[in-house]
Amino acid sequence: MVAAGLSVYAMFPERVGGPPLPVAVELGKGVMPTADGAGKLLTEVIVLTNLTDHPIPRFSIEINDQYLLIRDAPLAAKERLELPQRVFTDKRSNHRFNPIKYPVEAVTLTGQLPTGARGVTRFLFEDGVIIDTH
């Protein structure tokens, strides 16, 4: 029973709720190293900034309720993290997010707050601009 609950929790974190996670999100383009490390490439990125003076462990990012990235390392205090959108993988397969084919419509962030509570913030986007947060 617990395993089933955790599976639902992992697949649909926005349905669970919790206090807000103090992290800012931006969408844009950034220069990232190529896979072989031989050069750099301008690509679509998601930029996350920890707005607090404490690290956020158990940090995960989800795009469009389908593409997930779970970060092993905590998001450090005041850290600015820039990630290529193509590194996000489908929760049910190994397919990668394609920002050319699909626009980012929602970003859901989860992580552990200093109180031990699980923080959740969801950002809704339209044409790359935040239109709502909850």
Model segments located where?
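Short, surface-exposed loop/turn motifs at beta-strand boundaries within globular domains
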Residues: 39-41, 54, 66-68, 102
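Terminal connector regions
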Residues: 11-18, 89-134
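Structural beta-strand segments of beta-rich domains
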Residues: 42-46
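Asparagine-centered strand-capping/turn motif at beta-strand->loop junctions
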Residues: 47-53
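Short, hydrophobic/aromatic beta-strand segments
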Residues: 54-62
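Hydrophobic membrane-insertion alpha-helices, especially the h-region
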Residues: 1-9
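Intrinsically disordered, low-complexity Pro/Gly/Ser/Thr-rich segments with frequent PxxP/GP/PP motifs
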Residues: 65-100
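Short extracytoplasmic/periplasmic juxtamembrane "stem" segments immediately C-terminal to an N-terminal membrane anchor
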Residues: 20-38
